[in-house]
Amino acid sequence: MSVSDPLGDMLTRIRNAVGRKKTKVSTPASKLRARVLDVLQAEGYIRGYTQSEFENGKAEIEIELKYYEGVPVIREITRVSKPGRRVYVSVKSIPQVVNGLGISILSTPKGVMADHEAREQNVGGELLCRIF
């Protein structure tokens, strides 16, 4: 069965794993998913991830979730731009998440990055998701 929104599928897997207090979650691999996970790791929302490839050519990413004193670091993770309704923002209209406590992840011409990086580089793009 194919997934119509691979990034949304990964975010849902993370949300469900955090709700069940799992330490790891796996998802099929893609370049976009890996770039989003790079941002999440750099911002301190996940411990890390490993990518492995199987004999049949399929690749999988195993994400190691992060907890602080038993409480999940990720409280909320939501998809903003969806396949049926893309959301694009200019650098001036990049929203702050919970007054700057959370982050937005954007796909820009300069790559996938967090909202504060996009403001520094003065670039807008597709608003992929919000994390708090």
Curated annotation (Swiss-Prot):
The record ties this protein, via Pfam families, to: Ribosomal_S8
Record-linked InterPro entries: Ribosomal_uS8, Ribosomal_uS8_CS, Ribosomal_uS8_sf
User: Which Gene Ontology BP annotations are present?
Assistant: translation
Keywords of the record: Ribonucleoprotein, Ribosomal protein, RNA-binding, rRNA-binding
Q: What Gene Ontology cellular component terms go with this record?
A: ribonucleoprotein complex; ribosome
Transferase as a keyword of this entry, yes or no, is: no
Q: Does the keyword tRNA-binding apply?
A: no
Question: Where do the TM regions start and end?
Answer: none
Source domain of life is Bacteria
Which GO molecular function entries does the Swiss-Prot or TrEMBL record give? rRNA binding; structural constituent of ribosome
Cited function:
One of the primary rRNA binding proteins, it binds directly to 16S rRNA central domain where it helps coordinate assembly of the platform of the 30S subunit.
> Which HAMAP family does the UniProt record give?
Ribosomal_uS8_B
**Quaternary assembly:** Part of the 30S ribosomal subunit. Contacts proteins S5 and S12.
The UniProt family comment states: Belongs to the universal ribosomal protein uS8 family.
Q: What is the name of this protein?
A: Small ribosomal subunit protein uS8
